[in-house]
């Protein structure tokens, strides 16, 4: 019996060591991809143009402007410009409600699919792709049924599928319309426990160049980090970032990362800061709000952020 227990113990230990080695190697590969990106930034785009008007209407978030609107952990922003309308992320539906929270809010706010030209999925996490079921299936959805998106441009961070449509995975930066740019595939090491499934992940960021304002970044979670996103935007667009809207994944508390982000945006003298409550807690958001004053805008479902 003792011999059996010893053998079993060694086998279990061997399995644990082997798994640790595999996980370590995969994390190392993921970090190497991030390091390569930092060493070889993407090429600059020429003549990106500008939009005259930009309004960002949150359709799903962890805060709401009215009891008539649903809220939850996740993101869904309607980016409205004179060059086109883009839905950034498709929210989260953990209770499998039909209609989903984001679909309910679209009805309440008078938004239809006909209003949307492009679907822009920032990264492949359940709270940005409509729920765990769709995430597991390598796709995304607005609700419990995948609605017809034929004829719409669909931009995804990695190769995803969608019935009746052909999503385009992020690659090099590209101009989507005059003044609207997808900054391309920005790698990051995924967060635990999702990192156990796929350590290396991609997030894409939307950049909108607004006349007389400058470049506004629209972020889903900000996993690559604010500094990397700002540096990428300025390398690609050749002009300074003037604002940031969306997730920055600072978590709870006023951390060193929060202070570094504030300092970076102060250096840029930004015109707009709006942090998502789904991945930055009240203390961090309050620190940004206190620093930037009138330039800071809370994010809540149904509360439009009018840039120009």
Stretch-by-stretch model annotation:
Residues 4-83, 173-199:
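Zn-dependent metallo-beta-lactamase
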Residues 58-109, 199, 203-218:
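Conserved beta-strand hairpin/beta-sheet module of binuclear metal-dependent hydrolase folds
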Residues 61-62, 90-93, 124, 159, ...:
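Active-site metal-binding loops of divalent metal-dependent hydrolases
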Residues 84, 142-155, 268-273, 294:
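A short helix->loop->beta-strand "cap" motif at the edges of active sites that frequently abuts
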Residues 95, 127, 154-162, 247-252, ...:
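Membrane metalloprotein/metal-transporter helix-bundle signature
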Residues 98-153, 237-245:
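Active-site metal-binding motif and surrounding structural segment of the metallo-beta-lactamase
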Residues 118, 125, 205, 212-217, ...:
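Cap/insert and terminal regions of metallo-dependent hydrolase folds
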Residues 144-204, 297-308:
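Metallo-beta-lactamase
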């Amino acid at each position: 019996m003792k011999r059996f227990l010893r053998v079993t113990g060694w086998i279990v230990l061997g399995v644990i060591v082997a798994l640790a080695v595999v996980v370590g190697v995969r994390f190392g590969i993921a970090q190497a991809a991030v390091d390569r990106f930092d060493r070889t930034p993407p090429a600059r785009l020429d003549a990106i143009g500008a939009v005259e008007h930009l309004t960002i209407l949150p359709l799903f978030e962890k805060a709401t402007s009215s009891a008539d609107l649903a809220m939850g952990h996740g993101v869904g922003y309607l980016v409205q410009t004179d060059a086109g309308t883009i839905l950034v992320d498709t929210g989260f539906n953990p209770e499998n409600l039909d209609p989903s929270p984001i679909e309910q809010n679209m009805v309440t706010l008078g938004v239809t699919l006909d209003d949307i030209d492009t679907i822009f999925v920032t990264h492949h996490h359940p709270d940005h792709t409509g729920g765990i079921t769709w995430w597991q299936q390598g796709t995304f959805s607005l609700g419990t049924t995948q609605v017809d998106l034929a004829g719409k441009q669909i931009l995804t961070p990695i190769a995803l599928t969608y019935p009746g449509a052909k999503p385009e995975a992020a690659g090099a930066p590209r101009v989507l319309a005059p003044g609207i740019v997808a900054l391309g595939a920005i790698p990051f090491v995924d967060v635990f426990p999702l990192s156990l499934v796929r350590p290396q992940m991609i997030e894409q960021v939307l950049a909108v160049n607004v006349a007389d304002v400058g470049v506004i970044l629209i972020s889903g979670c900000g996993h690559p980090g604010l500094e990397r996103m700002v540096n990428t935007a300025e390398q690609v667009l050749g002009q300074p970032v003037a604002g940031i809207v969306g997730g920055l994944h600072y978590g709870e508390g006023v951390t060193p990362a929060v202070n570094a982000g504030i300092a970076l945006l102060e250096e840029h003298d930004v015109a707009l800061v709006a942090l998502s409550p789904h991945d930055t807690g009240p203390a961090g958001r309050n620190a940004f709000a206190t620093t930037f004053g009138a330039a800071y805008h809370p994010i809540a479902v149904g509360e439009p952020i009018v840039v120009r």
